[in-house]
Amino acid sequence: MTADSALYIPPYKADDQDIVVELNSRFGAETFTVQPTRTGMPVLWVPRERLIEVLTFLRQVPKPYVMLYDLHGVDERLRTHRRGLPNADFSVFYHLMSLERNSDVMIKVALSERDLNLPTATRIWPNANWYEREVWDMYGITFTGHPHLTRMLMPPTWQGHPLRKDYPARATEFDPYSLSAAKQDLEQEALRFKPEDWGMKRHGENEDYMFLNLGPNHPSAHGAFRIILQLDGEEIIDCVPEIGYHHRGAEKMAERQSWHSFIPYTDRIDYLGGVMNNLPYVLSVEKLAGIKVPQRVDVIRIMMAEFFRILNHLLYLGTYIQDVGAMTPVFFTFTDRQRAYKVVEAITGFRLHPAWYRIGGVAHDLPRGWDKLVREFLDWMPKRLDEYETAALKNSILRGRTIGVAQYNTKEALEWGTTGAGLRATGCDFDLRKARPYSGYENFEFEVPLAHNGDAYDRCMVKMGEMRQSLRIIEQCLKNMPEGPYKADHPLTTPPPKERTLQHIETLITHFLQVSWGPVMPANEAFQMIEATKGINSYYLTSDGSTMSYRTRIRTPSFAHLQQIPSVINGSMIADLIAYLGSIDFVMADVDR
């Protein structure tokens, strides 16, 4: 598959069983244990000894599962609702995507605490590398044959595996922290880069290589992010991205918050995405609860999500152009973002982190005058985008710094788990809002911007096109906003509609319990992915019939995008790396969670 090939994306079919039939035909139905879930995909448990065989088959089957979308683990030891599932102390899941089928499948493996070993999948999908490192970091599960199984998010000297159920979840459960001079020296020494550990040479045939730290506090790194560069002059021979400096333990926090009280934490994953972060989470919880929201809720959610897509892309545009040397545009983009925030603040009450979506609806209805504010923004913004394209994106210096730089094709993008504008810039027409509509996107008319060179310039141009399409979607929301309630009439809607609590004691009791303790979700698993600001973002939730999540897996696009860096930039110049980093569109909170 090349950047120029036309990849046909068939209509989405949830719970597509075709691959199950093919697997049963190849391996026998007795090989698999089928797990019923609300994830919208087949979930199959396989014996460990057949794992690589099954994964290889899925990678090579006609219309193959070319993308390892996600790979992570679960500590099963305290889970009570496991009827019909293989005995397991821990489990590892492999979430695979086939664009040619437009379907997913999840493969799970059960592990005993006495033998936490699996064969690596890095020979099948190169992007399994970081995911397996994170699983080892969080759970202590070893992947035999992995090229470099070391800490991913935690410091090199860290003791223990934080996502285990017996690992403390609150700071008060730890001993008081102290940092002696000796311990500080130990931590600093552990961070020292040793080229030999990564198979790098210090000397070539006729040259000595220099090793340069870009970050973790370099302005072009866009956050606390370190890339160690092996250089021959200014040419990048090899590099090692190092993440984890911004890790906050978001998935661990989800196990100690109620389904309702975790919503504000989602805002802080991609902290530029605002309510866009809430959407996959509440949609996944609503699948668990069996809640169908009113049409008005769908349209409100889409409108606000597209506002935050524009807000994100404006910041991206300004900082990207600034990274390659033009200082003025970032001030203009921030001025335009202020106009958008004026609308967001009027509707939600907050700006950067509204935490405004709710289980079963939104926090409150649209205020009086919202339509006038939205109309003013829609009248203003198109002219500004025209100016950006004319004044900045057609600039010869920008084009010279970015056209043909950090280029990759569709095949490479899929192998590394690249989604969003980074994938569509290669010519691959895959946007979840079209390919797998959610939250009512199937009712809107818009185009999917594409490019074909897959370089730093094309990624920016795709983002520009997306802003225009977001304006088009918001326009339709403005003109066709349905009447009706802003919350679903369902027992698990949280909080329940406030109006009834003043007259109905049972509703008042439910309101009190759901806000204080949290709603009790049925034991099951649910999954929702969305086309977020930076690519595909998803929440995979496991409920054990409690007021809190048993396991919350947050898959972010930026994690996959940064893992791809060495395969794209090796052999280029340092200046090209700066342009490449600016074109990716990432924030480290989205990477490290």
From Swiss-Prot:
<dbReference type="InterPro" id="IPR037232">
    <property type="entry name" value="NADH_quin_OxRdtase_su_C/D-like"/>
</dbReference>
<dbReference type="InterPro" id="IPR029014">
    <property type="entry name" value="NiFe-Hase_large"/>
</dbReference>
<dbReference type="Pfam" id="PF00346">
    <property type="entry name" value="Complex1_49kDa"/>
</dbReference>
<dbReference type="InterPro" id="IPR014029">
    <property type="entry name" value="NADH_UbQ_OxRdtase_49kDa_CS"/>
</dbReference>
<keyword id="KW-0997">Cell inner membrane</keyword>
<dbReference type="InterPro" id="IPR022885">
    <property type="entry name" value="NDH1_su_D/H"/>
</dbReference>
<dbReference type="InterPro" id="IPR001268">
    <property type="entry name" value="NADH_UbQ_OxRdtase_30kDa_su"/>
</dbReference>
<feature type="region of interest" description="NADH dehydrogenase I subunit C">
    <location>
        <begin position="1"/>
        <end position="184"/>
    </location>
</feature>
<keyword id="KW-0472">Membrane</keyword>
<dbReference type="GO" id="GO:0005886">
    <property type="term" value="C:plasma membrane"/>
</dbReference>
<keyword id="KW-0813">Transport</keyword>
<keyword id="KW-1278">Translocase</keyword>
<comment type="similarity">
    <text>In the N-terminal section; belongs to the complex I 30 kDa subunit family.</text>
</comment>
<dbReference type="GO" id="GO:0008137">
    <property type="term" value="F:NADH dehydrogenase (ubiquinone) activity"/>
</dbReference>
<dbReference type="GO" id="GO:0051287">
    <property type="term" value="F:NAD binding"/>
</dbReference>
<feature type="region of interest" description="NADH dehydrogenase I subunit D">
    <location>
        <begin position="208"/>
        <end position="593"/>
    </location>
</feature>
<comment type="function">
    <text>NDH-1 shuttles electrons from NADH, via FMN and iron-sulfur (Fe-S) centers, to quinones in the respiratory chain. The immediate electron acceptor for the enzyme in this species is believed to be ubiquinone. Couples the redox reaction to proton translocation (for every two electrons transferred, four hydrogen ions are translocated across the cytoplasmic membrane), and thus conserves the redox energy in a proton gradient.</text>
</comment>
<comment type="subunit">
    <text>NDH-1 is composed of 13 different subunits. Subunits NuoB, CD, E, F, and G constitute the peripheral sector of the complex.</text>
</comment>
<dbReference type="GO" id="GO:0050136">
    <property type="term" value="F:NADH:ubiquinone reductase (non-electrogenic) activity"/>
</dbReference>
<keyword id="KW-0830">Ubiquinone</keyword>
<comment type="similarity">
    <text>In the C-terminal section; belongs to the complex I 49 kDa subunit family.</text>
</comment>
<dbReference type="InterPro" id="IPR001135">
    <property type="entry name" value="NADH_Q_OxRdtase_suD"/>
</dbReference>
<dbReference type="GO" id="GO:0030964">
    <property type="term" value="C:NADH dehydrogenase complex"/>
</dbReference>
<keyword id="KW-1003">Cell membrane</keyword>
<dbReference type="Pfam" id="PF00329">
    <property type="entry name" value="Complex1_30kDa"/>
</dbReference>
<keyword id="KW-0520">NAD</keyword>
<dbReference type="InterPro" id="IPR010218">
    <property type="entry name" value="NADH_DH_suC"/>
</dbReference>
<keyword id="KW-0874">Quinone</keyword>
<keyword id="KW-0511">Multifunctional enzyme</keyword>
<dbReference type="InterPro" id="IPR023062">
    <property type="entry name" value="NADH_DH_suCD"/>
</dbReference>
<protein>
    <recommendedName>
        <fullName>NADH-quinone oxidoreductase subunit C/D</fullName>
        <ecNumber>7.1.1.-</ecNumber>
    </recommendedName>
</protein>
<dbReference type="GO" id="GO:0048038">
    <property type="term" value="F:quinone binding"/>
</dbReference>
